[in-house]
């Protein structure tokens, strides 16, 4: 399902770092365009870093929004939801390059079954297993799914799940 996908990884210093997500994504044969680890709650009011917004917008223009998959690693549901809202419906703070830009990108958190069940299980356990135990996985999944269903134009096809 993830093989040959073009992936942008937004890890979280207090959640799951970009490097851990990257190891999982690469184990599934995906191509990582960009990977970073940010402090989701450190940025102004939880808004996505402006430089990251610029890079995401550039990749969507270069490769087509339908070909981009965003994978998040946020520690909290609300912060992860803000990131998902930004890449699907536009920057809710109207501060960055994605203000008013509805890319509708395919966006998932690494703990969601659509991602977790499609990467190497041993790599996932080694890189993410411990952190997953302390996250409120159900709340994160509900938050991301809500934004994805409301604003996402591109989601992983059922056949891919």
Curated annotation (Swiss-Prot):
Signal sequence interval, chain numbering: none
Cellular component GO terms held in the UniProt record: glycine reductase complex
Active site: residue positions: 42
GO function term, MF aspect, one: betaine reductase activity
Catalyses which reaction(s): acetyl phosphate + [thioredoxin]-disulfide + NH4(+) + H2O = [thioredoxin]-dithiol + glycine + phosphate + H(+); acetyl phosphate + methylamine + [thioredoxin]-disulfide + H2O = sarcosine + [thioredoxin]-dithiol + phosphate + H(+); acetyl phosphate + trimethylamine + [thioredoxin]-disulfide + H2O = glycine betaine + [thioredoxin]-dithiol + phosphate + H(+)
Keywords associated with the record: Oxidoreductase, Selenocysteine
Keyword presence, Oxidoreductase: yes
Keyword Lyase (UniProt): no
InterPro entries: GRDA
Domain of life of the source: Bacteria
E.C. numbers: 1.21.4.2, 1.21.4.3, 1.21.4.4
Entry-linked Pfam families: GRDA
Family: Belongs to the GrdA family.
Function: In the first step of glycine, betaine and sarcosine reductases, the substrate is bound to component PB via a Schiff base intermediate. Then the PB-activated substrate is nucleophilically attacked by the selenol anion of component PA to transform it to a carboxymethylated selenoether and the respective amine. By action of component PC, acetyl phosphate is formed, leaving component PA in its oxidized state. Finally component PA becomes reduced by the thioredoxin system to start a new catalytic cycle of reductive deamination.
Subunit note: Monomer. Component of the glycine, sarcosine and betaine reductase complexes, together with components B and C.
Name of this protein: Glycine/sarcosine/betaine reductase complex component A2
UniProt source species: Photobacterium profundum (strain SS9)
Gene from which the chain derives: grdA2
